[in-house]
Amino acid sequence: MSHSTKRGDGSSHAALNTEHNETSPNGEISPDGIDRRGFLKCMAWAGTGLVWTFAGGVPVSRVFGQRMHSAKQSDFSFVQISDSHIGFNKAANADVTATLQAALDKIEALPHPPDFLIHTGDLTHSSKPAEFDTLDQMLGKKRQVFYVPGEHDTSVDDGKMYLDRYGKGSQGNGWYSFDQHGVHFIGLVNVVQLEGMGRLGQPQLDWLKKDLTGLKSSVPVVLFAHIPLWAVYPTWGWGTSDSEQAFAMLKRFVSVTVLNGHIHQVMQKVEGNISFHTATSTAFPQPAPGSAPSPGPMKVPADKLRDVLGITEVSFVVQRHTLAIVDASLSGALIQPGSAA
């Protein structure tokens, strides 16, 4: 998305921060770095990733690699990919189709194939028919894919081409919901008629209120949209101006998970009953919030590129109200700082 005059579709790969000063309710440092007393500071994680487990609404974190013993017993799983930017061919990554293919190969190699994929936007870089065609050919028909658009998918025609391809059964500019194994998923669109930051708009908020009506508060809810629904860095437009209206509707639910893309870096926050998570890109990294004059594609050494690109695997154990999120880089190596493009 863009902040006033700048497009902020980029992603920061986030400077590695391994020292968390968050505290437990009694004021002591908790082993998972979570301040359970209130609003969490934004936490950036490296490509080795972090596993979030939600047991009874209480978040517990594990470093990627410390897989849950119950993983084989999960009810179902899905994978989030984001910001493939098909058509981009500049210095930050001259072959985005190759890195997307690497991500898809990584998904195929998972020990337990996911039930479906979620793509959180910026499928293409320029909304060109050939770019959409390439993406469709690469994702193929092996499993179901749920999409939401990024601003790069709507920049030419306000998303008409995107809706013609991926909007069947959706409402408005492409929002919709569905249910899987007792979990309610909601795809939101916050990239149309941008006003400095992401925006949902009143028609979509009215639809969301109706969609949530009748759901029991015990039903796990997963929202996914392109631009972060939380204020990651408003100076760069990395947030959604009217998201608080949506969150007010979600307070009654025991477990709410929000998945976003757009900033091309893994960042997490827990606030009350809501867990926020942004994903890496499969195309290119971007600078950490505030670390450069503006967001944009960031060039890193060629042998480090796949360290800062990746996928997100999500598993659910519904009866235990448990959710686990695992971020994996394409190489499996630690994310390293890079230089601005």
Q: What is the meaning of each model-derived region?
A:
Residues S217-V232:
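Short acidic, glycine-rich surface-loop motifs adjacent to enzyme active sites
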Residues I325-A341:
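C-terminal/domain-terminus segments
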Residues E22-F54:
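N-terminal secretory signal peptides and thylakoid transit peptides that target proteins
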Residues F64, S70, K128-P220, D242-T257, ...:
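Extended active-site neighborhood of metal-dependent phosphoesterases/phosphodiesterases
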Residues M1-D35:
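N-terminal secretory signal peptides
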Residues I81-S82, L117-G121, F146-E151, F224-A225, ...:
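Active-site neighborhood of phospho(di)ester-bond hydrolases with catalytic His/Asp-centered motifs
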Residues I34, C42, G49-W52, P59-D133:
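N-terminal active-site segment of His-dependent metallophosphoesterases
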Residues K90, V191-R199, W230-T235:
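Surface-exposed cleft-lining segments at the edges of enzyme active sites
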